[in-house]
UniProtKB/Swiss-Prot annotation:
Role description: Immunity protein component of a toxin-immunity protein module, which functions as a cellular contact-dependent growth inhibition (CDI) system. CDI modules allow bacteria to communicate with and inhibit the growth of closely related neighboring bacteria in a contact-dependent fashion. Bacteria that have this module inhibit or kill bacteria without it, giving them a growth advantage. Specifically inhibits the toxic activity of cognate toxin DddA (C-terminal 163 residue fragment) upon expression in E.coli.
Cited Pfam families: Imm1
Name listed for the protein in its UniProt record: Double-stranded DNA deaminase immunity protein
Phenotype reported upon loss of the gene: A double dddA-dddI deletion has a 100-fold growth disadvantage compared to wild-type in competition experiments.
Source superkingdom: Bacteria
Organism whose genome encodes this protein: Burkholderia cenocepacia (strain H111)
Quaternary assembly: The toxic domain forms a 1:1 complex with the DddI immunity protein. This protein blocks the active site of the toxin.
InterPro entries given in the database record: DddI
Amino acid sequence: MYADDFDGEIEIDEVDSLVEFLSRRPAFDANNFVLTFEESGFPQLNIFAKNDIAVVYYMDIGENFVSKGNSASGGTEKFYENKLGGEVDLSKDCVVSKEQMIEAAKQFFATKQRPEQLTWSEL
């Protein structure tokens, strides 16, 4: 698996390394992860993580989904797309826990498909 974050790209070949990678928060107690297997970049998981929460996007050719969290409070949550402080405001309705994000990434690592344990909204 190719894994990219605030610090650059690495290759990951075992699930324990993936879990360790997903715990990295090099700036603002946050990170933006891109996980893929192909040079083309698809399918991919794109994860905005901050503290113990995340928003997960699944993208493949012709289909895009975003995680659906348990909050119906509306509003937005600030995440970061880089170490320079580039901010991204994402809907609180899409926020899932760190544990849910890790389980989704582990399933993606194993299957190369959209993780089934998250609820998704099609974009």
